[in-house]
């Protein structure tokens, strides 16, 4: 079964970190990403762009309305995502636990939300 992992961060907490701490934190991510990739269960992993570039599209009166920024104002924001293909819920938790946002970044408000996918359309 496939699962999507949403990697969250708290912009205010992340912005309050010293640049040297941010660099030290981010420098640890590639090794954890590679550990996850080495399982052969990672379908895709992505880091999302800056919030200033986000757009929300909504149907309104038969037309599509485009709004700048994230859909909701929230304390935590999705900063990345991944999709894994796990044989069981326990394996999904183990795999998601390898993601940097699940193991590092407490000071930046990092967290992972793991969600089973009901539908997945591959290209």
Task: Give a label for each model feature.
Residues 1-123:
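Conserved, structured core segments of small domains
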């Amino acid at each position: 079964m496939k699962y999507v992992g949403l990697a969250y961060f708290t912009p205010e907490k992340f912005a309050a970190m010293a640049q040297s701490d941010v660099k030290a934190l981010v420098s640890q991510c590639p090794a954890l990403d590679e550990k996850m990739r080495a399982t052969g269960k990672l379908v895709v992993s992505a880091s999302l762009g800056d919030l200033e570039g986000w757009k929300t599209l909504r149907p309104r009166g038969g037309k599509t309305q485009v709004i700048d920024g994230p859909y909701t104002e929230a304390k935590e924001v999705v900063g990345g995502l991944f999709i894994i293909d796990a044989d069981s819920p326990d394996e999904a938790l183990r795999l998601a636990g390898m993601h940097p946002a699940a193991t590092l970044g407490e000071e930046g408000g990092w967290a992972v939300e793991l969600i089973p996918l009901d539908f997945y359309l591959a290209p």
